[in-house]
Amino acid sequence: TLLTTNCVYAQTQGFFISQKQEKVADIPKSYSPYKQPANTPTVQVVADYNRSTAIVSKYLYGNNANPYMTNIVSQPALINHIKLLSPQILRYPGGNLSNVFFWNALPRQKPSDVPDVILYGDKRKIRPEKFWYGRDEGKNTLSLKNYYATLAAANSTGIICVNYGYARYGKSLHPVQTAAHLAADWVRYDKGRTKFWEIGNENYGTWQAGYQIDTTLNKDGQPRYITGELYGKQFKVFADSIKAAAREIGAEIHIGAVLIETAKEKSWEGAIEKGWNTGFFKTAGNAADFFIVHSYYTPYEKNSTAQTILNTATVETQKIIAYMKQMSADNHVELKPVALTEWNIFATGSKQMGSFISGMHAAIVLGELAHNKFGMASRWDLANGYNNGNDHGMFNIGDEPGVPRWNPRPVYYYMFYFQKCYGNQVISSAVSGNDKVLAYASKFSSGQTGLVLVNKGTNKQTISIKINNFKPGKRYYLYTLTGGDDNGEFSQRVFVNGSGPEYPSGGPANIATIKPLSASVADGIKIESPPYSVQYVLIENEK
C-alpha cells in the first residue's frame, strides 16, 4: 500500500516526500493511570489501519525564522524549545523583508544600484527604506551565518526566500539578471545545504517591495506595476540562473513560485491579484518546481469568535488544495507540489493569536494538511512582537508583560504533541455522534496507531475509539490539552493533562517530562473530551 500511495498522491507532495518518510513512535517510559469514563460514548471514532490514504510529509511541521528575532543562537532557552519542537524545516529571511534583504551585504552597505526609497502600492508614507543585511552580526538581528547555525542546532533543514523585488527596483542596465545572479550566488554559497528556494514573497501584494517601481530610475523598460505575467517571465530568469548554479556545485534544489491561494472575487481585490495566477502561467508555463501559497485563514483584523476561527482550519485548507488543482487544469499546466510557507490567523481584538484557540486551530490545520496531501508548511512565525496580544509569534520575544523572554505560547504545545503522536501515514477514519468532533488518524512505520481528536464544541463528549484491522498492544496513552478560565473564550494558557503554566500565559514548563495518562486496551478505548479540547492518543501495537 505504501508504494501505491506514493504513486497516487505524488502530485501535490512530490519531492517533499521523496525521501523515506519512516517514523518510529516514541512510546512513553512512564505514565499516570487513566480511569476510563464509565458513561456511554456520545461520539464514535472508527479508523481502518489497513486503509492508508496519504503519506505524511515530515515538512508539514515547519516554522518561520526572521532577522528581527535577534541573534537567537545566543539564546539557549529558545534554542532548547525549538530543538524539542523539532520543526524539521525553518524558512528565512521572511516575510516581506525578503524583498529588501541582501544576503551577502554588510550592515548599511546595500548594492550601489539600489535606490534609497522603495515605492509600494499601499498608503504608507514615502521615506528611506529599511534594508536588511545577511552579514549583520549585531545582537538585534539574525544573520545568515546564525540562521544556518540555528538549523544545525534544531536539526532542521531550510527553505530560503530570495530577493525578487531587486529585479524590479534595481537601477542597473539589467536589473532582472543582476537580481537573479545575486540569488544564484547564494545557492553557490549554500553548497547544497538548502533544497527549497522561493522566488520572492507575496509579490502580488501592494505591501511588497517591487509591486510598484519608479520607472524614471528603471533602465530595462519595466512597467510601473507588477503583473503575474511579468513575474512569470522574470521567474524563469531566476530559475535558469539558480539551477545553473546548483549544477555547478552538484546540488539538488527545487524552486517555488508565488501564487494566489484561492480565487480572488471580492470587489476590493484588484486586477493584479485577480489575474496573477493566469498571467504567471501564461509566461512561466511549467517552470516552477512547486507552488507557494500563504493563508492567514480568518477575516483580516476582525474580532473573530472561537467558532469562526476553528471552522476556517478545515474550510480554508480544503479550499486551497481544491483551487490549486482546478487552477492547474484551467491553465493547462502540471499540478506541482504545494507549499504553505506562511500560515496563521488574522483575528485581532481579543488576544486570539496567543490563545489556546489558536493552538486548537493549528492542530486542525496540521491534520487537514496531512489529509489533503500538502507537501510542506511553515507557520508564521517563531517570534514577532506582542502588540497588545495581536502577536503571531510562537514565543514571547521579550515584550509581553509578566512573562519571561522566549516563553512558549499555547500553540507550541499543540504542535509539539501533534508531531509526537501522529504517524507517517494517514489512515481513513470516520466520526459519528457529534459534528463538532474531528478525528485525524494515522499509523507509524513502527506499527503503532496515533490519533488527534478535536472537540471544537462547548459540551463535554465521551469518545470511543475503534481501529479496524489493527492488533493493539497492551496500552494506549493520552495527552489532553485544554485552556484556562482567563480572557473569555481566548485563554492565554494551556493545560496538559491538567498541568498548567506558572505565568499568565503559555503552558507547563516541563513539556519533555509530562507523563501521559494511560489505560489498558483490554476493555476498549474510551476517553473524555472536555469542551474546546484536543486529545492526542497513541495506541501500542501487538509485538
Q: Where does each model-flagged region fall?
A:
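Noncatalytic carbohydrate-binding groove/subsite architecture in carbohydrate-active enzymes
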Residues: 227-362, 372
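Conserved, mostly hydrophobic/aromatic
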Residues: 63, 86, 186, 197, ...
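Flexible loop/turn segments at secondary-structure boundaries
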Residues: 68-72, 97-101, 167-169, 204-207, ...
